[in-house]
């Protein structure tokens, strides 16, 4: 199976290929076939203009083939960089993008895609009660120019990656929801830190209430 490049229907290829893999035993495929399918699936996911969540592919064992490849392990790394909105990792891997014909042809789209990923990651890292983000903050976290921030947010809202509203006067985005996604170990570590910070805050509040209220409580 090859990517139907003439039709540029990468999303359809991606979904069809994953459905096919769900119906077969990977052990029945040759190493070459597994590698080819993992490669094409990864490229299709990246260049598609409608796929922004790679969770199903990241969890699929066929992707392990790329991790074992000296030539194409970077492609797996690139998928995970997109998943966590890692701009630094994207820049490190940019040489591989320019050397790959299909990815290079979609380089502008890929850059916009990583900016969107950086935006959703920035929102995800913040607690639900602290998701009113100024355009300046978003610009700093996504490396997008200030004059392009409103368009970036509107794009994320239109794609269903975020939900919320934009205050154009004060230049603030009020985000109420961010699309769930698969977390890698670095993201799990960040989530653990947030939970520990929250637990510490709750304990401090409990100690303060206990000290301030002493034995007098009103119901």
Residue spans for each PLM region:
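Charged, E/D/K/R/S-rich low-complexity terminal regions of large eukaryotic assembly subunits
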Residues: 1-22, 26-219
